[in-house]
Design a protein with these regions (language model features):
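Active-site catalytic microenvironments for nucleophilic, acid-base chemistry
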Residues: 31, 35, 97, 101, ...
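Acidic, low-complexity terminal tails and accessory targeting/binding regions
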Residues: 47-58, 104-119, 132-186
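Phosphate-handling substructures
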Residues: 32-92
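Generic structural signal for well-ordered alpha-helical scaffold segments
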Residues: 6-8, 88, 92-106, 110
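A generic local structural motif
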Residues: 2-8, 25, 63, 108-110, ...
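GST superfamily/GST-like fold recognition
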Residues: 127-131
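Short glycine-rich phosphate-binding loop at a beta-alpha junction
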Residues: 14-21, 109, 115, 120-124
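Active-site-proximal alpha-helix that buttresses catalytic centers in soluble enzyme cores
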Residues: 1-36
Length: 186
């Protein structure tokens, strides 16, 4: 499916590709952006699900910790894992680091004298990472779960902020729109 969507031009072009260090993100980045050296952002690693890791809801049915987590609306920390707040803080630190790399790229382009242009970057990350970043930095007012996206899906957005603001973690993600795919490729 990814290959067909890529061939149809449905994924945006990118000057820089940022990825989670986990294998499936690295492999997906290679499919979507072949030949580009991805920039690994450790902070974009998937959430630590603790005792729930690798288990589906059927396997967790009857587990008192799982039921408590469900009853909390997904706000409790994962037992022996990460809290949503800690996960979000980690992801946001990664976005701040990513923004610094993007600023360096833009300065280098400016020095080349080819005329400054806006950097096009792509992030190949986990759904939870997307949700964490858009909830924290998005200007659209959505909550964590409103930014869920399926495998191979995502959002386009515009990142903004002065170098000083970005250095303080004050980034704005605006014009947030889901990627739209042709119906015949699903």
């Amino acid at each position: 499916m990814l290959e067909r969507r890529k061939a149809a031009g449905e994924y945006p072009e990118a000057d820089l590709v940022f990825v989670s260090p986990m294998r499936r993100c690295l492999e997906t980045a290679e499919v979507l952006y072949p030949g580009q050296e991805p920039v690994v952002v450790e902070e974009f690693r998937e959430c630590d699900f603790g005792l729930f890791e690798g288990k589906n809801y059927r396997e967790l049915t009857g587990n008192v910790h799982y039921q408590a987590w469900i009853d909390s609306g997904g706000t409790l920390p994962f037992p022996e894992g990460e809290s949503r707040g800690a996960f979000q803080d980690r992801c946001c630190a990664g976005l701040v680091r990513m923004a610094g790399i993007c600023a360096e790229w833009e300065r280098a382009e400016e020095k080349k004298g080819t005329g400054r242009r806006e950097l096009r970057s792509a992030c190949v990350v986990h759904g939870g990472t997307v949700m964490a970043l858009l909830e924290r930095f998005g200007t659209e007012g959505g909550d964590y779960y409103s930014y869920q996206c399926g495998s191979g899906q995502g959002y386009r957005c515009v990142a903004g902020g002065s170098p000083e603001e970005i250095g303080k973690g004050e980034i704005e993600l605006s014009c947030i729109h889901p990627l739209v795919f042709s119906q015949d490729l699903s």
